[in-house]
């Protein structure tokens, strides 16, 4: 929470919770089909591949960490009524999962009637009936309590539900397709799911395959594959890294590590419908992103506040040795001087150390932007800067991301942001910066009653450190997944008082972390 007095904070409007949740929940598909895209006859599956059934159970039941569901977190399986009825009674509802059944007429009681009476009460805790199609189901799962209690929503059939999944608005939320190809043609099939569909607006990438195997029962050959929608926005980032490594100019730098660099690039990321551009080809440290951005918004300069939360991204620049190397011998250790947040909230004020109270001092650029957007959304001076030439010598590190301009689309009531970053560490810093300014734009939109629109990231010296080349080559081999969603579980009276615990990133499916050392 900000230590500023209330009159110097930015009050949140009554509309602050209007866009706390997405319109629809992201979801995945699990399906098995034959050579002709057949999935069954509407009542049963015309082949026996127990390995696929075991995969279905594990994929839809286990959490992403491969651990069993808990009282607080489990997955959901969304199905039509006929699919529900095709499940043997003894397995209804599917254990360890929330069963979401689509039916315009049936009630929970009717669906559970075939079960032994003594099991119905417990079973009722694992089933929800939705009067509508797939869109209605994922709309329900996007809201509390399900947005937090459900880790992954799986669409499991039948044919009409699968078909709906491939059409707008659902297809825009489809994150993964787990597809088992049964290498046979089943004449009994009367239901089909052609994937990938022809002439689809969405391109699909093969993310993984377990390889072609032979079933131990009937000897049928099968292959379990995972497809993801092509993430063009993350590919911008990967393609820029590839271009830098192939054509960049070799340069020496202040760290002594050396870089490959090019000058002038731009990337664009949609923030619409709570989308958060958190890169997926390696896990991005969201907790660090969020805590640092809130630290900026509060005008803080004490890196120890982050270190106390086990966030050590500023430890190197706040060390006694580094501060002394910058001539900041009078700064206490972890006092970074008038860096980012200080310039955002107190531009032009005289810096007197990390313990001083700066309420009302300098220009509060963030508050000015919020107030101006409300009064005149067409203003072309909606920008702030962290680059203060008069104070650079007092900073532990001159700002890398130094200028941001906001733009209001008055026709759509959307707020977009363009960031200019002078020095762009593509391996470590840029993924962090993308997520940070996305969150900033989302918060400023909340504070002004607007929807988040787009983040435009303009890069000056875009560089790859030589020590990061091997790690980035490995990252380039990975297939990007869909971006996650940001939801707000709690709201605050003032912008600066939001906390990490008030937000939750859902449906984030990244590749494992890749170790890269920071060049200091």
Swiss-Prot record:
The keyword Protease belongs to this UniProt entry's keyword annotation: no
The enzyme's E.C. designation: 1.5.1.3, 2.1.1.45
A Pfam short name: DHFR_1
SUPFAM superfamilies: Dihydrofolate reductase-like (SSF53597), Thymidylate synthase/dCMP hydroxymethylase (SSF55831)
Lineage: superkingdom: Eukaryota
Job of this protein: Bifunctional enzyme. Involved in de novo dTMP biosynthesis. Key enzyme in folate metabolism. Catalyzes an essential reaction for de novo glycine and purine synthesis, DNA precursor synthesis, and for the conversion of dUMP to dTMP.
Name of protein: Bifunctional dihydrofolate reductase-thymidylate synthase
Binding site for substrate: 30, 52, 162, 180
Pathway assignment: Cofactor biosynthesis; tetrahydrofolate biosynthesis; 5,6,7,8-tetrahydrofolate from 7,8-dihydrofolate: step 1/1
Family annotation (InterPro entries): DHFR-like_dom_sf, DHFR-TS, DHFR_CS, DHFR_dom, Thymidate_synth/dCMP_Mease, Thymidate_synth/dCMP_Mease_dom, Thymidate_synth/dCMP_Mease_sf, Thymidylate_synthase
Binding locations of NADP(+): 32, 38-44, 81-83, 102-105, 157-164
Annotated HAMAP family: Thymidy_synth_bact
NCBIfam families named in the record: PRK01827.1-3 (NF002497), thym_sym (TIGR03284)
Active-site residue list: 400
Record: residues binding dUMP: 254, 401, 421-425, 433, 463-465
Reaction(s) catalysed by this chain's protein: (6S)-5,6,7,8-tetrahydrofolate + NADP(+) = 7,8-dihydrofolate + NADPH + H(+); dUMP + (6R)-5,10-methylene-5,6,7,8-tetrahydrofolate = 7,8-dihydrofolate + dTMP
């Amino acid at each position: 929470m900000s230590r500023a007095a209330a009159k110097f904070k930015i009050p949140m409007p009554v509309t602050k919770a209007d866009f706390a949740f997405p319109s629809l929940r992201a979801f995945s598909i699990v399906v098995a089909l034959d050579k002709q895209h057949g999935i069954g006859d509407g009542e049963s599956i015309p082949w026996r591949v127990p390995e696929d059934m075991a995969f279905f159970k594990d994929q839809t039941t286990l959490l992403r960490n491969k651990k069993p569901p808990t009282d607080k977190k489990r997955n959901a399986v969304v199905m039509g009524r006929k699919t529900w009825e095709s499940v043997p009674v003894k397995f209804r509802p599917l254990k360890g999962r929330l069963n979401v059944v689509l039916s315009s007429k049936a009630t929970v009681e009717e669906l559970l009637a075939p079960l032994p009476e003594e099991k119905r009460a417990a079973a009722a805790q694992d089933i929800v009936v939705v009067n509508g199609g797939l869109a209605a189901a994922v709309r329900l799962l996007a809201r509390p309590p399900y947005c937090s209690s459900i880790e992954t929503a799986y669409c499991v059939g039948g044919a009409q539900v699968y078909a709906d999944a491939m059409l707008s608005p659902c297809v825009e939320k489809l994150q993964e397709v787990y597809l088992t190809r049964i290498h046979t043609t089943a004449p009994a099939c009367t239901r089909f799911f052609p994937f990938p569909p022809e002439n689809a607006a969405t391109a699909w990438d093969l993310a993984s395959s377990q390889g072609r195997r032979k079933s131990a029962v009937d000897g049928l050959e099968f292959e379990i594959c995972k497809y993801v929608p092509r993430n063009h926005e993350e590919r911008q980032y990967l393609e820029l890294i590839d271009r830098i490594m192939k054509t960049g100019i070799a340069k020496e730098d202040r760290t002594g590590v050396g870089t490959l660099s090019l000058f002038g690039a731009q990337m664009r990321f949609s923030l619409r419908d709570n989308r958060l551009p958190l890169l997926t080809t390696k896990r991005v440290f969201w907790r660090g992103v969020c805590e640092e951005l809130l630290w900026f918004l509060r005008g803080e300069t004490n890196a120890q506040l982050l270190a106390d939360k086990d966030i050590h991204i500023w430890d190197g620049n706040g060390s006694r040795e580094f501060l002394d190397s910058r001539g900041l011998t009078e700064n206490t250790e972890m006092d970074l001087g008038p860096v980012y947040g200080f310039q955002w909230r107190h531009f032009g004020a005289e810096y007197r150390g990390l313990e001083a109270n700066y309420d009302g001092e300098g220009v509060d650029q963030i508050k000015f932007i919020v107030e101006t957007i409300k009064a005149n959304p067409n203003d072309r001076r909606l920008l702030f800067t962290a680059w203060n030439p008069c104070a650079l010598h007092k900073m532990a590190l001159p700002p890398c991301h130094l200028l941001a301009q906001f733009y209001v689309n008055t026709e759509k009531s959307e707020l977009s942001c363009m960031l200019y970053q002078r020095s762009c560490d593509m391996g470590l810093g840029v993924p962090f910066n993308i997520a940070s300014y996305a969150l900033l734009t989302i918060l400023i939109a909340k504070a002004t009653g607007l929807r988040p629109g787009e983040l435009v990231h303009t890069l000056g010296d875009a560089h790859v450190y030589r020590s990061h080349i091997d790690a980035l080559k490995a990252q380039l081999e990975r297939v990007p997944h869909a971006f996650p969603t940001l939801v707000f579980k709690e709201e605050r009276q003032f912008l600066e008082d939001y906390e990490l615990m008030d937000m939750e990133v859902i449906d984030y499916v990244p590749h494992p972390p890749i170790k890269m050392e920071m060049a200091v």
